[in-house]
């Protein structure tokens, strides 16, 4: 169905630019001033007051892994909950956050693609295999900033992704690469240009036999390699409707199958997205967006004996359907030079439920669980900027209403249908006020000083509210009484740009996340615990709870330099997040949140000229704790990646990519009886590229 829908959209996308060309032929004056760019409204002048890092298309193409999560690692402080990427991680662990603001795997940073929020409607994680990097033209990462303009979820920051610019795309592109462990990566795209519009169609496929996630000293006969297979496709059309209005349509879909390295640990994700956006570029700028997202997720879980000789199935999360719908309207009135005002409203509704089989006896499930609900947020926002001489002032705010409905947790005996749990959770609702104020001043030409203060908020995901889960022998109970997270923060920084090819930025910040949701240790196995059932002797029982707060202070440095074909860039984030806790979580007071390293560093040195390129990227992650009690730590890790591209003819080229060149051990997790998992070992790729038109 996804492929059929993409084909239909491509036909429509092709017809729209053709129709625009026909109109132009009939009336040449109708299109002489039309410039179709496929982007949203212009960026706000007030962004000068924020800590913003941009990643351009050239840098995106040079990722050694070819994956979005690796590209984002160029921005120090932006991290997933775990260090593993989307070839071996459980998808539910792939939430994004910044500045050590976390506590669990849900995203605290808002990822937006062409204006559409991308977090999974049920669980808040990011489906990274859905985003082939050749479809991306620009990434803008805003550290901090609150929820004012972008909406709920933009607590620790925002990642804005724009689709590839047709001016930078060939008519036909194809890439084919073969890598370590029988890995295959293939991608192809086509571009149709017409006066007044364009259309693109692209597809990507990745597979591999995978590596053994469990480190050598922890392995047993039950451990095996973790293969993966992933596919995505997207169709996009942009057409001018008159001289000042653009119609942008997008349709995409993906499938993602992974394994976690033992029997009964396969997981599968599927999704499809559709969106329509109208952009008005006249004196009154405006934007109107509507979107639909559907997701399906399934995952198996296993228990491995102490000798790691046998894996036994413990849970089958056989289906987790989820849907997200929403829209956004924004207006930019003409106020004259130096003034910018945005007024708008947005809405997002998500619904979903997990369907699971558990409590296996003689290899057969004896119980069934269904849990889920619906969440709705809608809000009004305003954002104003004033530029007067060397100073830019910005002030914005929003008010949101939220509502949780249809929350339920039902468990029953499969053989008889007898209910074990029939919890119907009451409807909840509330109002959140957030905003941002900032100033940027350029006292002398190369120097810009900036400061900002902001508030943001995030509604708990349906996954956090209603679904218990397991990781190895450990189990975590849901909590339908969770409150929204609320963040307050201040930033101060300086940007130096003494020349066109050089820049340096430094930012200090203080953030406080009130009501931070974390997985709080509440017991140890063996034993039977509320919300999860039996936990084995090596297992830990945790409950999702609102902590009093997480306070994080830190420093961020970013530098770039380019001279002719040679360039370098570096990014360093140093954070000190600390838990503020009392009551049942008092033992966590003063500790660091799980999976939050003090230091993250990335540095790249490269050369580009005439289609040829070579670069190396060094990354370092400091020691971080596996658990909320800071009793288990993951060792620091330093990796080196390499990339080289050489044109053979005008259309053909060769690529060589190497991930983790020195095969460093990158620890990603510790579970059960000190079983350590690792991220991707050394992986080498050799590929061919085709570019025409």
Regions found by a protein language model. Give the residues of each.
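Gram-negative outer-membrane beta-barrel transporters
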Residues: 387, 393, 503-505, 509-513, ...
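Surface-exposed extracellular loop regions of Gram-negative outer-membrane beta-barrel proteins
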Residues: 294-298, 351-360, 401-420, 427, ...
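Outer-membrane beta-barrel signature, preferentially recognizing the C-terminal barrel domain
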Residues: 264-282, 316-325, 372-375, 421-442, ...
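N-terminal periplasmic accessory domains that precede
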Residues: 68-71, 94-100, 112-114, 126-132, ...
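Periplasmic-side early beta-strands and strand-to-turn transitions of outer-membrane beta-barrels
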Residues: 147-148, 160, 167-169, 175-177, ...
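Extracytoplasmic beta-strand/coil segments of soluble accessory domains associated
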Residues: 69, 73-116
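Short acidic/polar hinge/loop motifs at secondary-structure boundaries
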Residues: 116-143
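Conserved C-terminal beta-signal and adjacent last beta-strands/turns
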Residues: 6, 440, 451, 484-490, ...
């Amino acid at each position: 169905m996804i492929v059929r829908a993409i084909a239909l959209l491509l036909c429509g996308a092709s017809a729209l630019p053709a129709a625009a060309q026909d109109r132009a032929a009939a009336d040449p004056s109708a299109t002489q001033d039309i410039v179709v760019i496929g982007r949203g409204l212009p960026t706000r002048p007030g962004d000068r007051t924020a800590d913003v890092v941009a990643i351009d298309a050239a840098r995106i193409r040079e990722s050694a892994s070819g994956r979005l999560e690796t590209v984002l690692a160029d921005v120090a402080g932006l991290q997933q909950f775990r260090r593993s990427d989307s070839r071996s991680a459980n998808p539910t662990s792939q939430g994004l956050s910044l500045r050590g603001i976390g506590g669990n795997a849900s995203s605290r940073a808002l990822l937006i693609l062409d204006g559409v929020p991308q977090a999974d409607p049920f669980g808040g994680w990011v489906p990274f295999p859905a985003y082939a990097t050749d479809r991306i033209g620009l990434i803008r990462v805003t550290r901090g900033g609150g929820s004012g303009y972008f909406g709920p979820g933009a607590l620790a920051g925002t990642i804005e992704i724009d689709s590839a610019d047709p001016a930078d795309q060939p008519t036909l592109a194809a890439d084919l690469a073969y890598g370590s462990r029988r890995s295959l990566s293939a991608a192809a795209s086509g571009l149709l240009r017409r006066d007044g519009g364009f259309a693109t169609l692209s597809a990507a496929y990745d597979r591999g036999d995978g590596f053994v996630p469990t480190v050598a000293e922890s392995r047993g006969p039950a451990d095996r390699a973790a293969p993966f297979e992933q596919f995505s496709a997207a169709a996009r059309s942009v057409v001018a409707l008159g001289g000042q209005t653009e119609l942008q349509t997008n349709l995409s879909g993906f499938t993602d199958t992974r394994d976690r390295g033992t029997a009964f640990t396969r997981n599968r994700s599927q999704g499809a997205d559709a969106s329509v956006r109208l952009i008005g570029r006249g004196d009154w700028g405006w934007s109107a967006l509507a979107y639909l997202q559907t997701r399906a997720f399934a995952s198996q879980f296993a228990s491995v004996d102490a000798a790691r000789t046998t894996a036994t199935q413990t849970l089958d999360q056989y289906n987790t359907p989820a849907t997200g719908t929403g829209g956004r309207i924004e207006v930019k009135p003409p106020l004259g030079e130096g003034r910018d005002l945005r007024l708008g409203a947005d809405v997002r509704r998500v619904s979903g439920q997990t369907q699971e089989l558990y409590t296996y006896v003689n290899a057969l499930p004896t119980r069934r669980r269904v849990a889920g609900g619906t969440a709705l947020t809608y809000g009004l926002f305003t954002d104003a900027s004033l530029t007067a001489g060397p100073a830019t002032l910005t002030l914005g705010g929003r008010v949101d209403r939220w509502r949780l409905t249809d929350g339920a947790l039902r468990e029953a005996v499969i053989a008889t249908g007898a209910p074990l749990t029939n919890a119907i959770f009451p409807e909840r609702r509330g109002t959140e006020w957030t905003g941002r104020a900032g100033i940027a001043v350029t006292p002398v030409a190369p120097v810009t000083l900036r400061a900002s203060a902001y508030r943001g908020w995030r509604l708990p995901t349906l996954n956090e509210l209603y679904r218990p889960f397991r990781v190895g022998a450990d189990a975590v109970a849901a909590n339908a009484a969770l409150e929204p997270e609320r963040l307050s923060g201040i930033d101060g920084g300086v940007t130096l740009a003494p020349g066109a090819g050089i820049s340096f930025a430094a930012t200090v910040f203080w953030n406080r996340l009130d009501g931070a949701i974390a997985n709080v240790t509440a017991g140890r196995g063996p034993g039977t615990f509320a919300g999860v059932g039996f936990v084995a002797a090596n297992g830990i029982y945790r409950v999702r709870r609102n902590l009093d707060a997480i306070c994080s202070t830190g420093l961020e440095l970013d530098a770039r330099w380019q001279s002719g074909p040679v360039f370098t860039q570096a990014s360093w984030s140093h954070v000190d997040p600390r838990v503020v806790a009392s009551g049942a979580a008092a033992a966590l007071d003063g500790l660091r949140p799980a999976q939050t390293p003090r230091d993250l560093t990335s540095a790249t040195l490269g050369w580009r000229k005439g289609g040829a390129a070579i670069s190396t990227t060094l990354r370092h992650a400091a020691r971080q704790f596996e658990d909320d009690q800071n009793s288990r730590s993951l060792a620091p890790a330093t990796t080196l990646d390499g990339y080289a591209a050489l044109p053979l003819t005008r259309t053909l080229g060769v690529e060589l990519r190497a991930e983790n060149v020195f095969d460093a051990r990158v620890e990603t997790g510790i579970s059960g009886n000190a079983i350590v998992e690792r991220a991707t070992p050394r992986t080498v790729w050799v590929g061919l590229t085709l570019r025409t038109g």
